[in-house]
Amino acid sequence: GLGDVYKRQVQFWADKETGCSKNFWLRSTGWYLMALVDCIALCSEQLYEHYRALVDIFRESIRGVLAYRAEDGLFYQVIDHPEAEGNYTETSGSAMIAYSLLKGVRIGVLDAEKYLPIALDVFEKLAANKLRAEEDGVVRLTDICWVAGLGPDKNPQRDGSVAYYLSEPKKSDDSKGVGPFIMAYSEYLRAKQA
């Protein structure tokens, strides 16, 4: 079946048994969580079986990622290797997680009593730690991984290793961070007004 396609090792960077990448890159996890919560929000009762499956996957994924929350309240560029030299709490993926948590609470698939305080805290820590005023008064959104990815085999540097993910440059005000930050902020405002 289709599931077998995802288990096969088809890329040079993939684990030969699982077909998965060796490590967990934060922004890819953030994209996944955002896609899940946005699809859940669009599902109708006619798709109830699929809706329940998506909700279960979303909840499990949220529990999993929260286990790796950093001391500053955000999430590392390589999620499960906080000890790696040069690893840092990355802005775009942390914003995506904040958005996913806040929207998950708002649409009722995450328990508000348990997850709303966490969701609010992630966003507040994101704003406090990653919005920085420059000497000229311009406020910048910092520590955004500029670009990362896997493959192709013509570019073996993009091998999914911790070293690779941490070698990509950080930028300020990159749209891949600003967009999710604005989305998270809109959910934050809705939560605060509720």
Short names for language-model regions:
Residues 33, 37-40, 51-66, 98, ...:
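Hydrophobic core segments within long, regular secondary-structure runs in both alpha-
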Residues 89, 105-194:
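CBM-like carbohydrate-recognition segments
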Residues 31-50, 95-110, 180-193:
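Well-ordered alpha-helical scaffold segments within catalytic/enzyme domains
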Residues 11-13:
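Zinc-dependent metallopeptidase catalytic helix centered on the HExxH motif
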Residues 20-21, 57-60, 64, 68-95, ...:
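Extracellular polysaccharide-recognition and catalytic grooves
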Residues 1-6:
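Short, small-residue-biased leader/transition segments that mark boundaries at the very start
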Residues 15-34, 50, 69, 74-95, ...:
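Solvent-exposed loop and edge beta-strand segments that line ligand/cofactor-binding
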Residues 8, 39-43, 65-72:
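A short secondary-structure junction motif
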